[in-house]
A protein has these predicted regions:
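Conserved ABC ATPase "signature" region
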Residues: 205-223
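ABC ATPase "signature
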Residues: 41-45, 313-314
Length: 326
């Protein structure tokens, strides 16, 4: 898309105003750059000069916002999740001479992988490669074919009622922190909602105390629990979404592009938080993203997807040192 925009700009001799928080895109396509902070332009310059010699402290902070990298696991345990021959199909309906014709579109094709406790599997690929379909299939938000085993138990064919007991062990954090939190509920209600389903034996007081603790664990103040989502920034909302997943004490968390809607400095903070929580609680992550910088910081192993297929699956160091696929 960026190449197309740049091609059209040159062809029609038009100007292009690009608004983004992705500095990699800015560096690639922009001639001049304006940096904004709190509604004001704090620095503007030619792209090459701004990236080589930034002047304002906020610009320097953005450019230097590199997340710390995860320490690789040396001793691996038995797989916590095994996926074998996963296939996902979507019904695609078209009209041909006023007659409806249904065709199956295969989003995921014979995908298999294993992940051990405490590991992070990074899944990367272009839009439409099947990344999010994998995530949704694993928590049974969409139907799929194949088998997946959680701690050696085949959970792929369980009914919704049977799978409910596993939901607290496998949680998901979605991409958009603005859409994934109900605007009608307080943060207390949002974070503690899962407790009322999976831990009905807990009293209201116990739930409130647990919610306070988990909110503190993600770097927020428990005095914020009576507020509503619109009162928080994007980064704070994603911390709330993380707290909602953590409160059920899961073993596996699937993160579907959780940093893509955040600016560079906040991305780095969220990555650092996820790494700290993983070390503290021995969490296993499946992290889906198209941002290789974030994937590199978080992952132990990386799976590259294209058109629903795995085209490369290797340890992080090998993928970045000697990628096999173009």
């Amino acid at each position: 898309i960026l190449d197309l925009l740049d091609k059209l700009r040159k062809k029609y001799k038009m100007s292009l105003l690009l608004i983004t928080h992705d500095l990699g895109i800015v560096k690639k396509i922009a001639n001049r750059v304006c940096v904004m902070e709190k509604g004001k332009i704090v620095e503007q310059n030619d792209s090459s000069k701004l990236f080589s010699k930034p002047e304002h402290i906020y610009t320097k902070k953005l450019i230097n916002s590199e997340p710390r990298e995860k320490k690789l696991i040396k001793k691996k345990s038995d797989p916590i999740l095994s996926v074998k021959n996963l296939n996902v199909f979507y019904k695609k309906t078209s009209r041909f001479f006023l007659k409806k014709k249904s065709n199956d579109c295969q989003a995921v094709k014979n995908l298999s992988f294993e992940i051990s406790k405490g590991e992070t599997l990074g899944i990367v690929g272009e839009s439409g490669s099947g990344k999010s379909s994998v995530a949704q299939a694993l928590i049974k938000l969409i139907s799929s074919e194949g088998n997946f085993f959680f701690k050696n138990k085949n959970i792929s064919n369980l009914s919704d009622k049977e799978f409910r007991s596993y939901r607290k062990n496998i949680q998901i954090i979605f991409q958009d922190p603005f859409a994934s939190l109900s605007p009608r509920l307080t943060i207390q209600d949002i974070v503690s909602e899962g407790l009322e389903v999976h831990y009905k034996e807990k009293t209201k007081k116990e739930m409130k105390e647990l919610t306070k603790k988990i909110i503190n664990d993600v770097g927020l103040d428990s005095t914020m629990l009576s507020r509503y989502p619109h009162e928080f920034s994007g980064g704070q909302r994603q911390r709330i979404a993380i707290a909602r997943a953590l409160i059920l004490n899961p073993e596996l968390i699937i993160l579907d592009e959780p940093t893509s809607a955040l600016d560079m400095t906040v991305q780095s903070q969220i990555v650092d938080l996820l790494l700290s929580l993983q070390e503290e609680k021995q969490l296993t992550y499946i992290f889906i993203s198209h941002d290789l910088k974030i994937i590199r910081a978080l992952s132990d192993k990386i799976m590259v997807m294209k058109s629903g297929k795995v085209i490369e699956f290797e340890e992080k160091k090998k993928i970045f040192a000697k990628p096999k696929n173009e």
